[in-house]
Design a protein with these regions (language model features):
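Post-HEXXH active-site segment of zinc metalloproteases
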Residues: 206-214, 293
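Metal-dependent nucleotide-binding catalytic modules
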Residues: 3, 8-9, 284-286, 314-400
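Short, conserved phosphate-binding/catalytic loop or strand-edge motifs used
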Residues: 145-152, 188, 194, 200-208
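Alpha-helical phosphate/pyrophosphate-handling elements in metalloenzyme active cores
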Residues: 108-109, 157-188, 227, 264-266
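Alpha-helical scaffolding flanking metal-ion-dependent phosphate/phosphodiester catalytic sites
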Residues: 167, 187-201, 219-316, 325-327, ...
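All-alpha helical catalytic cores of prenyl diphosphate-utilizing isoprenoid enzymes
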Residues: 136-140, 157-166, 197-200, 240
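Non-catalytic interface/linker regions that flank or bridge core catalytic/transmembrane domains
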Residues: 1-160, 359, 370-400
Length: 400
């Protein structure tokens, strides 16, 4: 066993112990009661040799990852050193509407962007950088509001573009929590935004199929990392650190991912970050073949995947502390019977976030000016139930 493998195994064992300890504490508090079964990790399905031969560029690129690997450690001043956080009372209605419009516009821009990439009409990464930069400016001063928008379930059959924007935002949050610099965080966010562009080459009858995919369809779907890389290699200005993300974002540090079944340190840290964002986004949004999970359940699923070694436990713990076990934007029921929305995490006590109370004890909605914020770490009030988004009628900006 190499020194790198020994280090990784030791670190993973430590993360598993810490994660299990936290899960036991949550169980003692009664948070696991009534949970749905956790989604199973898909079985590995390797690309057949014929496809691998046809797309040999992807295999060559994969071997280059080992050379690039040292470049994915945090370098330079951490982005968090320059970040602030607006309080609920400091947000104006025009500002909130402008931020929501920026998010919605980005989804439309990604739709256009992906189409142009497929047609070979994108010569440089300027448009990609501009989308990420517009989010970064807001993220630097109001991360909580952006992550609330990302946490709101998508509606409509074609999830690809919405999913890409949300994955970008969650990856940006993970990158900052991991101590990456501004330039590195931008690279991670760019890679996340482009991670699923290869899905554009998957037939819609498969990509949008209602119901579970059969083995042949799953085989076709799992081509998209290599297809995405082949599309993006023609876009000038994308660094190899960015390009590795679309190629590796379905690899798992346990070796159970695809397209190359790479494991441990062979999976770049950038890709591990985006993998977590990808899984969380997928679990919290409805698909044609399943309902979405309550964000709380999705976070528990991530913890389970981190504990089993499928996903990076270190980054999941950082995500937990920046989102809370009841993630930003979640609806929860308090012991008083009131329904509230999570509006800010509590890094030291991740079961006790700051919430905005949206209803009274009987469930009747409160007026806009009657909504109050409660820091559960400094209150006798506590969360007794995580609720799906459709539990009450509310808007994405309510409580913020």
């Amino acid at each position: 066993m190499s020194k790198h493998s020994e280090y990784w195994d030791t670190r993973r064992d430590k993360e598993i112990r810490q994660t299990l300890s936290e899960l036991r504490a949550l169980a003692d508090a009664g948070y696991f009661e009534g949970l749905q079964p956790q989604p199973a990790v898909p079985e590995d399905l390797k690309l057949q040799s014929l496809v691998a031969a046809q797309l040999s560029k992807g295999a060559v690129f994969a071997r280059k990852v080992q050379v690039l690997k040292p470049m994915d450690n945090p370098v330079g001043p951490a982005l968090t050193q320059f970040m602030t956080q607006l309080l609920v009372r400091d947000r104006t209605e025009p500002y909130k509407q402008e931020t929501l419009k920026k998010f919605e516009d980005a989804v439309g821009q990604v739709r256009i962007l992906f189409g142009k990439i497929v047609r070979g009409e994108i010569a440089s990464n300027a448009i990609i950088r501009s989308i990420v930069a517009s989010f970064l400016d807001t993220f630097m001063k109001d991360r909580n509001l952006l992550l609330n928008l990302a946490a709101f379930p998508q509606t409509g059959p074609d999830y690809l573009y919405d999913h890409s924007v949300k994955m970008c935002l969650f990856s940006l949050s993970l990158a900052s929590a991991a101590g990456y610099s501004r330039s590195q965080s931008i690279e991670i966010a760019q890679g996340a935004l482009l991670a699923d562009v290869g899905m554009m080459l998957i037939p819609e009858r498969i990509r949008l199929k209602r119901g579970k995919l059969n083995e042949g369809e799953l085989f076709e779907m799992r081509k998209h990392p290599i297809l995405g890389l082949s599309l993006l290699e023609h876009v000038h200005g994308l660094s190899e650190a960015v390009l590795v993300i679309p190629y590796q974002h379905h690899e798992r540090i346990s070796g159970s991912g695809y397209p190359d079944s790479r494991s441990g340190q062979a999976v770049s840290r950038f890709s591990r970050i985006v993998s977590i964002a990808d899984v969380f986004t997928a679990l919290t949004n409805q698909r044609s073949y399943r309902e979405s999970l309550v964000p709380y359940q999705a976070m528990l699923s991530l913890l389970s995947m981190g504990g089993s070694g499928h996903l990076d436990g270190e980054h999941i713990r950082q995500f937990l502390r920046t989102m809370s076990i009841f993630p930003l934007g979640s609806l929860v029921r308090l012991a008083s019977g009131k329904v509230a929305k999570v509006v800010s995490p509590n890094a030291s006590e991740f079961t006790k976030p700051v919430v905005s109370v949206l209803t009274n004890e009987s469930g009747a909605p409160l007026g806009r000016f009657d909504i109050v914020q409660v820091d559960l770490a400094a209150s006798d009030e506590k969360i007794v139930e995580a609720l799906p988004h459709h539990s009450i009628t509310h808007g994405v900006l309510d409580g913020f």
